[in-house]
């Protein structure tokens, strides 16, 4: 009986070892990790960080719902470039995804992302000695525009800076 118990115990131990040896063992690590072709971030508790900003070196990156770095996308009032870095102190032209089929809206909108990475919103910005206005959506305003009760001419969709003095405008093709 003792011999059978020893054999059963040995077989059980061998079976247990075989089952356990197939399980992967992970080293405790946190911070930036490369998984395949993607960079991801694990917090101090070992959880994958999702839907959050994390800094690497001097640059900020946004991690999407899958934990991977988001690239070439506007995220709330910020924008990340094709490497996933938050854009700062830069102009960015983005495709109109708000109402792309409307003939009254442009195909693209211009944004200016300031030093903190946020897009300029409802404010004037001086850039290269020229003044630009950005509306409540962060779009560069163009054409004849009323701002705080005053009327301004802010150029075309491609240049958008405030004009002063006399301006000769092309005839409006929609005028009767």
Predicted regions and their residues:
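Extracellular adhesion/carbohydrate-binding repeat motifs centered on closely spaced tryptophans
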Residues: 2-176
């Amino acid at each position: 009986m003792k011999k059978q118990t020893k054999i059963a115990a040995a077989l059980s131990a061998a079976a247990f070892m075989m089952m356990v040896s197939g399980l992967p063992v992970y080293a405790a690590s946190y911070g930036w990790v490369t998984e395949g072709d993607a960079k991801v971030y694990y917090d101090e508790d070992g959880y994958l960080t999702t839907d959050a900003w994390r800094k690497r070196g001097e640059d900020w990156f946004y991690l999407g719902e899958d934990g991977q770095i988001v690239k070439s996308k506007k995220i709330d009032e910020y924008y990340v470039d094709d490497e996933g870095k938050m854009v700062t102190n830069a102009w960015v032209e983005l495709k109109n995804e708000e109402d792309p089929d409307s003939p009254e809206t442009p195909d693209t909108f211009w944004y200016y992302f300031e030093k903190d990475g946020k897009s300029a919103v409802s404010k004037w910005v001086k850039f290269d000695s020229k003044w630009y206005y950005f509306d409540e959506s962060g779009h560069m305003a163009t054409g004849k525009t009323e701002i705080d009760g005053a009327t301004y001419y802010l150029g075309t969709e491609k240049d958008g800076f405030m004009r002063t003095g006399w301006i000769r405008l092309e005839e409006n093709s929609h005028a009767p």
